[in-house]
Amino acid sequence: MSRTETDSLGTIEVPDDAYWGAQTQRSLENFAIGGQRMPLAVIHALALIKKAAARVNDHLGELPPEVARLIEQAADEVLAGRHDEHFPLVVWQTGSGTQTNMNVNEVIAGRANELAGNPRGGKSPVHPNDHVNRAQSSNDSFPTAMHIAAAKAVHEQLLPAIAELSGGLAEQSARHASLVKTGRTHLMDATPITFGQELSAFVAQLDYAERAIRAALPAVYQLAQGGTAVGTGLNAPKGFADAIAAEIAAESGLPFVAAPNKFAALAGHEPLVILSGALKSLAVALMKIANDLRLLGSGPRAGFAEVKLPANEPGSSIMPGKVNPTQCEALSMLACQVMGNDSTISFAASQGHLQLNVFKPVIVYNLLESIRLLADGCRNFNKHCVAGLEPDAQRMADLLERGLMLVTALNPHIGYDKAAEIAKKAYAEGTTLRAAALQLGYLDEAQFDEWVRPEQMLEAGHHG
């Protein structure tokens, strides 16, 4: 069953049970591309905008109070997720997001008219353009929704997830603060380090990334709403931009404000590019963490084998008993995806022409995917890898005892050249540093035992 809806192009048949109208139906028919639906976070952000706009327009005398109440009620239902199935459009549409903006306008109007006792859909008493979209353009509403969706996702999903992973690593770092092992640079043996110190670097890297993400947020809080079509604010009443930003801030609990330059807010997306760059920095840190733990857990008999990674599942379909570092692999793959998303976002943001960037849907799609992947990745990695991480203390001690770079502690006492000679002799003859040093006669047993003490080589100020 269908009903007839109209727009400026004429009439079109719409499924009878759909809340959307003519423009959404045309988009469905004309843009059957891929399966990437517009993220619901964007839909819900647009619904929040429509609710806030109805309230502000009511206060400013731009809408009849009864129409404003109907819009608010319908928008609240959308925000609650009650009509998610009525937003079927894909990302691959007009670059301004107009089709999705109209999808939201039509669904809210269609539901509002039903609430008023009329048949589903239609344009009376609530019109999707004249009432729901009052004082707005897709050109300012969609970028505003992009900022709202991104900021909410960072606060609600990503920051708590970073805190979980950072906390898990910090706990492991504290637990193993005195477990001495071989440090490595260039993948070669270096001077000693504790396992706790090694893990503390991961915590600090996450902290740098988190601070970069938080530093990007103030610009994301600046909203394009009120700029309307080209940034001038045409057809928006005086004071609308500040009023709707305040309304959105109150509803969301985040400090949104009106962007100081609406022309830039429509034509460019620097705040989201900066946020994406910060997300990439987190991906870089996660890649490092995953790769390091994968190396340390390599083996169990022919690798580093210093760390036992939790076994989440059998690792091979052909090699019985094999366990693979699957959590590290999953985390590193999603880090790659985030880096790729950042490249897409950067290129898309560079393609604004004159007064409008028309790559908005692909920007927000990739940005929200990055946030979701990073949040899920941090939580999953902490729960299924970091929490169950077990260092092999005996293996660490064995490798440390055999390490040649302990000779570095002798530098202040016998000089670099003699210390290097000891290391080369020990390596060439397969003997210990102690034996090589004594054979060369550069020091006696007591001196070696006093000066070469790994547990005292862990901080500045030690000279053996």
Curated annotation (Swiss-Prot):
Single GO BP term: tricarboxylic acid cycle
Record-marked site positions (Important for catalytic activity): E329
Active-site residues, record numbering mapped to chain: H186 (proton donor/acceptor), S316
EC number(s) given by UniProt: 4.2.1.2
Reaction(s) the record says it catalyses: (S)-malate = fumarate + H2O
Gene3D superfamilies: Fumarase/aspartase (C-terminal domain) (1.10.40.30), Fumarase/aspartase (Central domain) (1.20.200.10), Fumarase/aspartase (N-terminal domain) (1.10.275.10)
SUPFAM superfamilies on file: L-aspartase-like
InterPro entries for the chain: Fum_hydII, Fumarase/histidase_N, Fumarase_C_C, Fumarate_lyase_CS, Fumarate_lyase_fam, Fumarate_lyase_N, L-Aspartase-like
The keyword Cell cycle belongs to this UniProt entry's keyword annotation: no
Intracellular or extracellular location(s): Cytoplasm
Residues that hold substrate according to the record: 96-98, 127-130, 137-139, 185, 317, 322-324
One example GO MF annotation: fumarate hydratase activity
Gene Ontology CC annotation, any one: cytoplasm
Domain of life: Bacteria
This protein's pathway: Carbohydrate metabolism; tricarboxylic acid cycle; (S)-malate from fumarate: step 1/1
Protein keywords: Cytoplasm, Lyase, Tricarboxylic acid cycle
Described function: Involved in the TCA cycle. Catalyzes the stereospecific interconversion of fumarate to L-malate.
Subunit description: Homotetramer.
Family that this chain belongs to: Belongs to the class-II fumarase/aspartase family. Fumarase subfamily.
Record PANTHER family: ASPARTATEAMMONIA/ARGININOSUCCINATE/ADENYLOSUCCINATE LYASE (PTHR11444), FUMARATE HYDRATASE, MITOCHONDRIAL (PTHR11444:SF1)
UniProt miscellaneous comment: There are 2 substrate-binding sites: the catalytic A site, and the non-catalytic B site that may play a role in the transfer of substrate or product between the active site and the solvent. Alternatively, the B site may bind allosteric effectors.
Name of the protein described by the UniProt record: Fumarate hydratase class II 1
Gene: fumC1
